Structures are given as C-alpha cells and as structure tokens.
C-alpha cells in the first residue's frame, strides 16, 4: 500500500506527514524561495508537478501529491504575497536530477514524494532556469486574465 503524504500549517510551521505521522517540519519564515514546476502553461492547479522550497542550506522537494502547492500555498495567500518569494517555471525549461523526478504513466519511477536535498546540489540547476515571478497563484491568474483581454497592452511590444 502506498504511503499518504500531506503537508499542513501549524502556526508558523509547515509540517510534513507520512501516513498521519509527522516526519518533518520547517519554520515558514525561514523559507527564502518557493519554485513551482508545472506542466504546460501552469494554468490549472493540476498542472503543478513539484514544489521546491529553498532554505538557507537545503532545498525541500515536494511532489504535487503532498499538498504543498495546494493546501500550504492556498491557505496563506497573504503570507506568500508579503514575502514575494513564489516563482514558477515550466517543467519543459527545468529539470530535476533523475532521482527526484517522477516517471510518467508508461515509465513509473519510485521518486520520493518528499526529500531534503543540500542546496548546493540544486542551486546550479535552479539558477539556470527561466523563472517567472515573484507572483502568487492569484497574481498569476489575474495576469493571465489581463493578457487574454482584447487590446491588452503587450509588454513585449515597443513603440
């Protein structure tokens, strides 16, 4: 039977559970940056693949099924907006080390649902990614709406 992984807020801490047993805890104010890897345009919550949480010396890698991108992100919009530390990148432009990636349906792998990784291992990869942000999910949604309007100002066009 597969283990059930969950994340939840407890005060100023984010707690990681495996089968309802606490396995890790991070003090949220210690988070320096959160990077969400998404499929396609990342328009729907189901497009999120991984959340990478950067601390001073470590990165926490969460698979989408842990709820970090859902429960933890959505329950405290004001916290993330104030911190301005949430970034986004398409999985087409960013790749994790093979041991951290989850396989597709046709080639499943046993990648971890949650793992702590030394920051020096992931920093060179993340620094090479073309990150969008900082922006919360709500800010990202409104940007998509603005960009889809007819006659919307295109920041890429120059007079």
Segments (PLM) and residue ranges:
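Eukaryotic intrinsically disordered, low-complexity regulatory linkers and tails enriched in Ser/Thr/Pro
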Residues: 1-159
């Amino acid at each position: 039977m597969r283990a059930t992984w969950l994340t939840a807020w407890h005060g100023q801490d984010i707690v990681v559970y495996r089968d309802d047993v606490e396995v890790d805890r991070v003090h949220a104010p210690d988070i320096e940056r959160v990077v969400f890897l998404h499929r396609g345009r990342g328009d729907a919550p189901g497009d999120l693949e991984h959340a990478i949480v950067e601390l001073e010396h470590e990165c926490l890698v969460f698979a989408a099924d842990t709820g970090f991108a859902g429960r933890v992100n959505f329950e405290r919009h004001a916290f993330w907006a104030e911190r301005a530390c949430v970034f986004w990148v398409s999985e087409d432009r960013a790749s994790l080390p093979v041991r951290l990636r989850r396989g597709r349906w046709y080639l499943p792998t046993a990648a971890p649902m949650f793992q702590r990784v030394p920051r020096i291992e992931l920093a060179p990869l993340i620094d090479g990614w073309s990150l969008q942000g900082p922006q919360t999910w709500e800010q990202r949604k409104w940007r998509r709406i603005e960009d889809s309007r007819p006659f919307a100002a295109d920041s890429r066009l120059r007079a």
